[in-house]
Every structure is written in C-alpha cells, then in structure tokens.
C-alpha cells in the first residue's frame, strides 16, 4: 500500500525507527496512514510503553497482604484497615518543566492528581522531588522559581496540601531539571474504579475540559533528549486549569459513588489515543471514537491533532447504558464538558471516525499491550570511569587534626578549615540547607489534616479523617506518612548501592515519625539507555530497588520511567543527568499521639545513636564512609569513591526497634543521619528545637572528618527523656539479647538549654557554634544564592 507522506521524515518526527515501521506494517497487514503512525509514535514511546525498561521492572516485588492494586492501573492502592484504603503514585514532568517551568510543573501536579481520583480516591496530599543545576547560574534560578510557583499555584488552587518533598542541586541537572510529583488519595469503599472497558455497546463518555492543540506529541517529546531545537517546542507543553480540575474531582467522585461508571481513564500522555487504547486493551475489547463529538476549543482540528493533543483536565468513561444522560448532567452542573463520543466494541480495535469516515483503525493491544521491547546488553563490569572512582581511599585526603583539616593550596577555601567552618559550609550547601523558601509557597494546611508539616519531621504525616464527615478531627487517631528520597550522588557512583540506599532511607524516614512502611511507588529518572553506561545504571538501580524492597517488605505498586534525561550542548556533547531513581514510600501511623519529629524537645534529654555505631578503630567499616559524601563534594570538590554498603538486616532491626520505642514512649525525637553525617544531623535537630546539644565522641583512631561527616545507612539519632534512662537501657539490652551480635546503640550526649552546639572528644573541643549562626547558614543558603531579600525569606 502506497502512502501519501514521507515515511522517513514521519518516522523522525514520531521518534520511531525503521524497524518499528516494518513491525507496524506487519501487524496491520498494510502500511499505516499518517494518523495511525502518529498513534503508534506516542504509544510506542518509552514514556508510554517502557520499551527499554519493562524487562527490568518485572523483577520488582508487587504483592503483599496490604496490596489491593498493583502495577498496571492509574495508581497503586494499599489497604489501611478500618475500611480505608490509600491510592498513591509518582509521575515525572521533566522535559515540559525544562521548556515552561511554570506550566510544566503545574500540569505535572494536575496529571498525578487525576491518576489518584480516577481510582475513586479523594486526593489528600501532594509531595514532590525536584532536581536543579547550581543556583549560581541564572537559568537555574529561573527554573526553580517557575517550577515552585507552578506546583504551588496548581496545588493551592485545587485545594490539596503539598506536605513534603526533597530538593537537590547538581550541575548534571542544569539543562535537564527533574520534576517528580507524588499524590495520595483516601478511599472508603470497596469499589475501586479500574480502567479496563467492558460491556459491548456501552457508551463512552468524554468529560472535563475541551481539546485543543496544546501538548501535541508530549509523550514522544518526553522520550527524547533535550536539544536547542526542542527547547523551542512550546506546543509540547500543556496548559492547566486547577479550578476546572477541582470541579472535575468533585464531579468524578460523585459519579463513581453512583455506580454508573464501569471504567475510567484520565487523558494524560498521548491523550485520547492512550485513553482509548488502554481502556480497550485492558478490557479485552475495542472502542469506537467519533471525533466530531469531542468537545474542541479550536476550529479545524485534524484527526492527528485530536488524537495526540494532551490538553489537560480530561477524562474518558465507560458508562452503564441508560445512565449517560444523568451522568453528563452532573458534570455540566460543575461547569464541565460532557459528551458521548463513542462506544465499546466487541472487535478488539481502536476505531476513529471523523465526518462519518474511518480515519484510523488499529488493534488495541498493538498500541497498549503487545508493544515492542528494546533489548540491551548489560556490560559485566562497571564503566572505566566508575572503576577509577571506586579505587579512591580516604587516606588520599589531607591530614586532619583536632582543629580541623589542612587543605592543599589549590582549595578555593584556603589552606585550612576548622571543624566549625566545615559544618557551616555544609549547612550552607543548598542540597542540605533549609528548603523553607520552597515549601513556604505551598499551602500545606488546606483540608486541615496535616499533622507534620514540611521541615518538622523526617516524613510528612496526614490525618486519616473520614471523608464522609463522620467524627471530628480530635476523634481521629490514625494517619498516613509519606516521603520521597533518592541519594543521586550515590546512585551515580554505584547504581545498585545507591538504589538500595534510596529505599532504605525512605523506610527509615517513615520509621523516624513512627510509621510502619507499607509500599513503594518509584520514578526512574535516567539518561539514555542506549549507551552501555546508561543501561548499566538503569539495570543495576532496578536490581538494587528490587533487593531492598524485598528485604524491607515494601512492594512496588507502580510508578513512572523517565529516560533520555540529558542535554545536547552547543558543541554537540551529551550531558546526562545523574541517574535518579526517586522512591516514594507510604506508611501507616497507628496512633497520631505518637508521631515523632526531629526537634529536640527538652533540655536534659539523652542523645543516642541507633544503628551503625561511630568507629572506635582505624579499621574502615564498609557501612559508613566519606566516599560519595556531601563533605567530600562540598569541601574537597570530589564526587568519588564507592558508597557504603547498606546492611539491610540491620536496617530492618533498627527501624523496627525505633518504631516500637516510639510507640512505648521512650523516644521523644528521631532524625536519620543522611547528607552531612552526624554533625549535620545534630545541627538540624538543634535548629528545629531551638535547643543546644553537647556530644562527646568516643575515643577513636579513625579520622575526625569520618566521625563527624561520614554517611551510611541504618543510623538514627534519637533523644530519650533522662527520667527514662534506666528503663531505656533495659529495653536496649533486651533488644540486643534478642539479636545476638547486633551492636546498634551508642550514647553520645545530652540536649542543653544553652543555645549552642558543642561536640568534643576526650575533652577536646571539635565544634562549638551558637544556634543563631547555625540557623543563619541553614535558612539563608538558598535565598542568598537567588538574590532574594534575606530579611523576608526566613
């Protein structure tokens, strides 16, 4: 069959390969027309079909006693007990945010919210994981300003609190920022709304906003590297309306309660093409779509434009016959569009009509189920660049002493730095520093269920308030905790260890607030998998995620894969991002009265380190290291070394012990040791509680910078009331008796009323800093770099 278009040019435009075209022709038993080729282009993109990553994802654990819905639906669902379930998912909007930071981020929030309420859940919380280049670059300042404003605008207007997240900075993200949005929704019904169509002849109803030309080919755009040309591709960025989405949420939840909707699918990536093909394929049926009935906001739209538009705030339903009129009236009352646009077919195809003619007909499973898989060879050895970094040893660093470190003459800090100066420089690192400038723009109290606000604890906590209006806030004692984590520098240096650390830290953060970790949603942000290094990073990170999720009993319920996160520079060089597998994890708080924050609460409280203890010998513990640490990068300008091993058995033991200790009332505060190690964690607890601390480090032959700033897993700082000292020691002894050989506690010091942080060893002062100086560095690091008024930014 001859075609009326330039095949080679069309394939380039759609991001398809010649082999893909041959396969399409084989499946159709003919050549596709231009509309059909566009449908295949978006549906066979990595963004929609995971053609490079699907075999790797199959290794993830996806089942568990609390899992109600796993991968494959709009969102995962876990059973919370007491008749409540939680829907949750994370998605990326990276490439659109690089082009139009405000709209890219805003529509990312809108899209993840639709994934949640499409399941029949009411959205109760948002989180985000963001990555940018250094703030010394004005373009990066513009990106973070636009992204944060977009997230705040959409979330605040739609009435869903943004309760937590993380922000990190690295030069690898300068041309390709990462914007990952996570949402949680509460369900109080056994009726989960799924997306598979059923009921031959049942009407297909379109609801929400009109269809325009915005977001054309967004899925294909998201599956390619960013270039100078693509940065001018503004039509690939959608435009959102949070007020319309608010009405869509309420109308959809009303419709789902009626029982008249038998299947639902939001229109996200690939728009109508994806919605129709996924609903048809999952239901084992077909869908006929009449474009003349689709509400349009622009005249003269072609079938290609209708099918590939990614206009926001749109949904597709399969509805029980006879109920379509009442359902559409409900949406119209909310000021939304509603129209019958097709029907369910027995033949397993997506058939598209315009002006009474068939403009496209494609087998549904060819678009949404039986899609291509690109196989890549996994190299047996790490790339040479990484092998060289793994050879680095701590003894290559300059000599340290009680007063600090003797730097070489090439250091931009001068020849010497005291431990005080080093701690202040770490607190001034934007990745470590306070993110108050970011989260103060978010409404985190809307819905009045936020128990633990951003910056207060290691994870966000939201009250599980009944959605039916039964019971006051005071009567609700259960909550859900959520967190997003990824140590991207570790993943860059060792993808498997870094991914394990991401899962372990997420679970650790949940445990620090007293929550039982339940399940994971992941967002795999990686460069191109078509290079040996790129695929090695992706494959080993997936291996690490799988291993950690199995060990910590946190199944994966779904997520998102975002590849080709790299920028082609003006000289033609490719700049890939650091591989960033963001782990979103949710946990159950059985009693909100026991929620734990990171702030010191009372002078005199005892400070203990749980988990891997501080070294007392020169021998290097592989579980704690300066390799890949914030200290190494910030002070020495090095991103090198092999990150520490995570002892998953100890991780489970320590986290379980911590949760039990919080429940029993022993632990007043808890904070995990992460970026910057012990010294930074203690400083953060002091700043949060406006109280000082005196720590006496054990005598040790190990380097002092290792004792103060080394990083690793299974390390949690807790404070315990002095009145509980004897009982606490008894509990510790019982735990160690139950786990012979486990050493996971170390007394370090005491919380003080003095507004200073004092760290000593054998009576020698290492660190002595007033709280106001710690706080100033911590709070002003980001605003200062952005040139903001510091007096109004803290």
Curated annotation (Swiss-Prot):
Binding site for Mg(2+) 1: 91, 560
Source organism (scientific name): Prochlorococcus marinus (strain MIT 9303)
The protein's name: Phosphoribosylformylglycinamidine synthase subunit PurL
Reaction it catalyzes: N(2)-formyl-N(1)-(5-phospho-beta-D-ribosyl)glycinamide + L-glutamine + ATP + H2O = 2-formamido-N(1)-(5-O-phospho-beta-D-ribosyl)acetamidine + L-glutamate + ADP + phosphate + H(+)
Gene3D superfamilies for this protein: PurM-like C-terminal domain, PurM-like, N-terminal domain
InterPro entries attached to this UniProt entry: PRibForGlyAmidine_synth_PurL, PurL_linker, PurM-like_C_dom, PurM-like_C_sf, PurM-like_N, PurM-like_N_sf
Family the UniProt entry places it in: Belongs to the FGAMS family.
GO molecular function: ATP binding; magnesium ion binding; phosphoribosylformylglycinamidine synthase activity
């Amino acid at each position: 069959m001859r075609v009326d278009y330039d095949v080679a040019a069309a394939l380039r435009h759609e991001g398809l390969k010649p082999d893909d075209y041959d396969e399409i022709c084989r499946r159709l038993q003919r050549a596709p027309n231009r509309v059909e080729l566009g449908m295949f282009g978006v549906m066979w993109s990595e963004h929609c079909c995971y053609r490079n990553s699907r075999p790797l994802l199959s290794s993830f654990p996806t089942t568990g006693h609390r899992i109600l819905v796993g991968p494959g639906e709009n969102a995962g669902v876990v059973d919370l007990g007491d008749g409540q379930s939680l829907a949750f998912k994370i998605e990326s909007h990276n490439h659109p945010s690089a082009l139009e930071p405000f709209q890219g981020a805003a529509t990312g929030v809108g899209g993840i919210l639709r994934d949640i309420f499409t399941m029949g859940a009411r959205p109760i919380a948002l989180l985000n994981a963001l990555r940018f280049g250094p703030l010394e670059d004005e373009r990066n300042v513009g990106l973070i300003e636009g992204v944060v404003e977009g997230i705040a605008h959409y979330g605040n207007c739609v009435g869903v609190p943004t309760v937590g997240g993380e922000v990190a900075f690295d030069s690898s993200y300068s041309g390709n920022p990462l914007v990952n949005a996570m949402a949680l929704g509460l369900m109080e019904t056994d009726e989960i709304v799924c997306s598979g169509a059923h009921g031959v002849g049942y009407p297909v109803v379109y609801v929400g906003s009109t269809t325009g030309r915005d977001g054309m080919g967004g899925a294909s755009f998201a599956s390619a590297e960013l270039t100078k040309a693509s940065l001018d591709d503004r039509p690939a960025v959608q435009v959102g309306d949070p007020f319309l989405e608010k009405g869509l949420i309420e109308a959809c939840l009303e419709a789902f309660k009626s029982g008249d909707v038998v299947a639902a699918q939001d229109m996200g990536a690939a728009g109508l093409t994806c919605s129709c093909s996924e609903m048809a394929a999952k239901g084992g049926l077909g869908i006929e779509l009449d474009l003349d009935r689709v509400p349009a906001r622009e005249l003269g739209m072609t079938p290609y434009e209708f099918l590939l538009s990614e206009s926001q705030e749109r949904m597709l339903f399969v509805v029980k016959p006879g109920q379509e009129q009442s359902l559409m009236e409900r949406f119209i009352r909310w000021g939304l569009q509603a129209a019958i646009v097709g029907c369910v077919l027995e033949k397993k195809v997506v058939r598209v009509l315009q002006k009474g003619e068939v403009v496209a007909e494609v087998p549904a499973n060819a678009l949404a189920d039986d899609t291509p898989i690109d196989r890549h060879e996994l190299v047996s050895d790490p790339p040479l660049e990484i092998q060289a970094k793994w050879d680095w040893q701590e003894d290559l660093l300059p000599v340290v002493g009680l007063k600090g470190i003797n730097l070489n003459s090439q250091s931009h800090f001068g020849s010497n730095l005291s431990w005080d100066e080093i701690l202040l420089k770490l607190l001034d690192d934007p990745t470590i520093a306070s993110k108050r400038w970011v989260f103060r723009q978010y409404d985190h109290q809307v819905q009045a269920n936020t128990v633990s606000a951003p910056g207060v604890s290691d994870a966000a906590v939201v009250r599980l308030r009944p959605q039916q209006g039964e019971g006051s806030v005071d009567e609700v004692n259960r909550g859900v905790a959520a967190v997003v984590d990824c140590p991207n520098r570790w993943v860059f240096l060792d993808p498997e260890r870094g991914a394990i650390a991401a899962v372990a830290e997420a679970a650790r953060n949940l445990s620090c607030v007293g929550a039982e970790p339940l399940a994971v949603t992941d967002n795999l942000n990686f460069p191109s998998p078509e290079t040996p290094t790129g695929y090695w990073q992706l494959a080993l990170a997936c291996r690490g995620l799988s291993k950690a999720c199995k060990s910590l009993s946190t199944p994966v319920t779904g997520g998102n894969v975002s590849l080709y996160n790299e920028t082609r520079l003006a000289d033609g060089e490719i700049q890939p991002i650091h591989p960033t597998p963001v782990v979103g994890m949710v946990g159950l708080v059985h009693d909100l009265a026991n929620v734990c924050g990171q702030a010191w609460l009372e002078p005199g409280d005892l400070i203990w380190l749980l988990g891997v203890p501080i070294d007392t010998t020169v021998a290097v513990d592989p579980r704690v290291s300066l390799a890949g640490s914030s200290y190494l990068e910030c002070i020495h300008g090095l991103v090198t070394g092999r990150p520490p091993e995570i002892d998953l058995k100890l991780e489970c033991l320590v986290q379980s012990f911590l949760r039990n200790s919080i429940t029993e009332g022993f632990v007043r505060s808890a904070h995990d040791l992460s970026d910057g190690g012990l010294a930074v964690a203690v400083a953060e607890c002091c700043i949060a509680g406006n109280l000082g601390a005196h720590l006496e480090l054990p005598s040790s032959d190990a380097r002092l910078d290792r004792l103060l700033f080394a990083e690793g897993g299974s390390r949690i700082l807790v404070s315990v009331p002095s009145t509980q000292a004897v009982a606490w020691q008894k509990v510790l002894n019982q735990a160690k008796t139950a786990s012979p050989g486990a050493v996971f506690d170390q007394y370090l010091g005491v919380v003080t009323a003095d507004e200073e942080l004092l760290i000593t060893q054998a009576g020698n002062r290492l660190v002595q800093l007033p709280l106001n100086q710690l706080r100033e560095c911590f709070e002003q690091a980001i605003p200062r770099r952005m040139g903001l008024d510091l007096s109004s930014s803290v």
